[in-house]
């Protein structure tokens, strides 16, 4: 999400839609604000994604099966090494450019629609609103379930 005008910047978001049999679906996310400062990271790198996965593992417990898009950071050699070091993590990749199969893309779509009519704000105000909207989504399991259902993927355990 970008903000234009004085004090512009960007809010980057990385998220996971998590399903565990017998539990409500979960949305786990991280945000990063970029204010345009020199040497400030503009987005997420491998360590950030791994920290998100580690957090999901800690919150959910047990092994994780990750169905991931083909973002270049997700496919990099450093990321593959980090994933290989986690015996509890199995990764399956979605086909190239398949946002319709990724429930997280549905989360971003719902979020963006909810932000469409906002007046211009500062980047910090925008970041706070984004976190608030994502926090609300975390407590709407029916929404997360519907976003998974829209993908058409059968994610039930065998």
Labelled PLM ranges:
Residues 1-158:
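Short functional hotspots at interaction and active-site rims
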